[in-house]
Amino acid sequence: MKPTQSIMSRYKIAQSKNHYENFTVGSLVLGKDMREAIMTLYAFARLGDDIADEGNHSKKERTEQIQYLKNHLKKIEFNQKINDSYFKILQILYIKYKFRINNLYRFINAFNEDINHKQYAQFSDLIRYCDNAANPAGELILSLVKQDNKENVRQSNAICTALALINFAQGVVEDFEKGRIYIPKDEMKTFNLKVEDIQQRNFTKYWVKYKKYWVERNCQILGRGLGLGEKIKGRLGIEIQMVECAALLLLKRMKRNSCNLFVSPPKIKTLDWIFIFFKVALRSL
């Protein structure tokens, strides 16, 4: 069976899953063409994630499925005939927008890394992973509107890395159940953090201290990207500003002493998005 079979159905299912992604994809703020383009690219990322997370298949089987995706990217890149229905859509998108396809290859690297995941030794290793797993998303979106200059990409990468780190903090327990720990080994040792605490959902004083450290560092990373949305014209700029506001709100909630990441990690709810939309809209007047 092709790994892309019924991909749009899989994508719709993924949208309804109780996963830890807080940020809008293909928001109604965007125009129809841009929304469909972003959703098509997002479907690629979600499909790769789903393959990497599929515990019922062996590493070999999952690696072969990821290779299938990579082979079809090459067909798109070299304008070869494609029979796979999803990649036909992606090929049309590539011809229309001429987005930087190397960013999809970076996703491939991240998918393979997920399949063979080992806990990272240092924070710099985690940042390197984010550069493949998260940053290409922002760069792809900027390339759709030909706004992927060096400075915009720098800001976008800071935002996307911060979003990924927020998701890691929210999903410590969920990731652990998948056999993954995104907290670097050296920091677990420095802060006296125990793997058993994650398993038992025991948010000790050591985890509280580390959470504050994690949030402060993440605020600094996010700060390097703030303001990108105001620079991008039109609806996409509004969308980026909304994401920036959502990230700030989540970090603010994480910082609270009452926030237990193992039991009730903060999320962005519908009412929050409504408030954020009006906040950004008023700012844009």
Task: Label the predicted regions.
Residues M1-A164, A169-L285:
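Catalytic cores of Mg2+-dependent Asp-rich isoprenoid enzymes
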